[in-house]
Amino acid sequence: MMLNNMLNDVPTPWGMFFQDSATPNMEGMMELHNNVMFYLCMMLGFVSYMLYNMLHNNKSVLPYKYLYHGQFMEMVWTTIPAMMLLMMAFPSFILLYMCDEVMAPAMTIKAMGLQWYWKYEYSDFMDDKGETMEFESYMIPEDLLEEGQLRQLDVDSPMVCPVDTHMRFMVTAADVMHDFAMPSLGIKIDAVPGRLNQTSALIQREGVYYGQCSELCGVMHSSMPMKIEAVSLGEFLAWIDEQ
């Protein structure tokens, strides 16, 4: 269990569950998933029980006396699924609107997808030339990886973000459609040429988070990873000064 928790911040071969959440949005998605799975397991158990009874007693006439017409049974198998759907729908809609809401961001980062790399722009900060701070992020080739770096996930210039800060991500593309997806942050947003999509995030713990382009964008589609380093506000400001 401890090993599983340690590895859940990054994609793992044959991974069977979500990566560890680092934002309220992702925490809500995981909770919704667990609730929906509870109702699905209940329904699966009920249907399996009914099928077993039908197959086990298929030679007896008595069990089928009220099977083809029974007002109580019809009411039960209509009311209970309807209640389950409502109990799944309300939390789902609340989470959907919460994820779309951009709440007074303290800073904005623009991510632009290109074949086959990402370009990040920190709109709230200027460099020494008085221009908006921006840089490009390329995947590190396999033959240049250092010990501890991840194949097809590590990049030469990661995005750096402060924790406990409301951030707005503005996503677009310059050539074809891409997709900015960061599982641990609960972010998955299309990067469309000529269109500026936005989402928000509040990273609650320091760490390194990985994502990958999730829209088929060409031959090197699998070579467009994203890497976010979440640091304290002081470390973030020190990093800004170094750029």
Swiss-Prot record:
It comes from Brettanomyces anomalus. It catalyses: 4 Fe(II)-[cytochrome c] + O2 + 8 H(+)(in) = 4 Fe(III)-[cytochrome c] + 2 H2O + 4 H(+)(out). This is Cytochrome c oxidase subunit 2. Residues 1-35, 100-243 are mitochondrial intermembrane. Pfam families: COX2, COX2_TM. GO terms for cellular component: mitochondrial inner membrane. The gene is COX2. Its main location: mitochondrion. Cu cation A2 binds at C213, E215, C217, H221.
